[in-house]
Amino acid sequence: MRFALTVTGPAYGTQQASSAWQFAQAVLQEGHELACVFFYREGVLNANQLTAPASDEFDLVRAWQSLHDEQGVALHICVAAALRRGVTDEREAQQLALASHNLQPGFTLSGLGALAEAALTCDRMVQF
């Protein structure tokens, strides 16, 4: 079965993103395909490379990156939601004359078209 996830909660402060990551792990362990994860609203904060959790805390931002690096799961970030919340890649930062960029490697700024494509091509879409 082919899955896609939508994450609307931040990396820290709510349970949504960590539950989504655990669900993603279970999907893959059961032999299913995880096509992509689409981060929307506050969920875009999962792509902020400037997070620095304590050494005894789970680093969810880097865990998402590992999911991409090790399993090839596409990590889409809604570009409009990201820019509103101060998450941007190098290209957008230059285009908008911002001083810096902070998009964690492995994540891609995308439009809602990526979410629509996932809805059309996956058997299940689960929102967290």
UniProtKB/Swiss-Prot annotation:
GO MF annotations in UniProt: sulfur carrier activity; sulfurtransferase activity
The keyword Zinc is annotated on this UniProt entry:
no
List the active-site residues. 78 (cysteine persulfide intermediate)
- Where is this protein localized, as stated in its record? Cytoplasm
| Enzyme Commission number(s) of this protein | 2.8.1.-
Q: Which PANTHER family match?
A: PROTEIN YCHN, SULFURTRANSFERASE TUSD
Function, as annotated, reads: Part of a sulfur-relay system required for 2-thiolation of 5-methylaminomethyl-2-thiouridine (mnm(5)s(2)U) at tRNA wobble positions. Accepts sulfur from TusA and transfers it in turn to TusE.
Q: What's the protein called, per UniProt? A: Sulfurtransferase TusD
Q: Which organism is it from?
A: Klebsiella pneumoniae (strain 342)
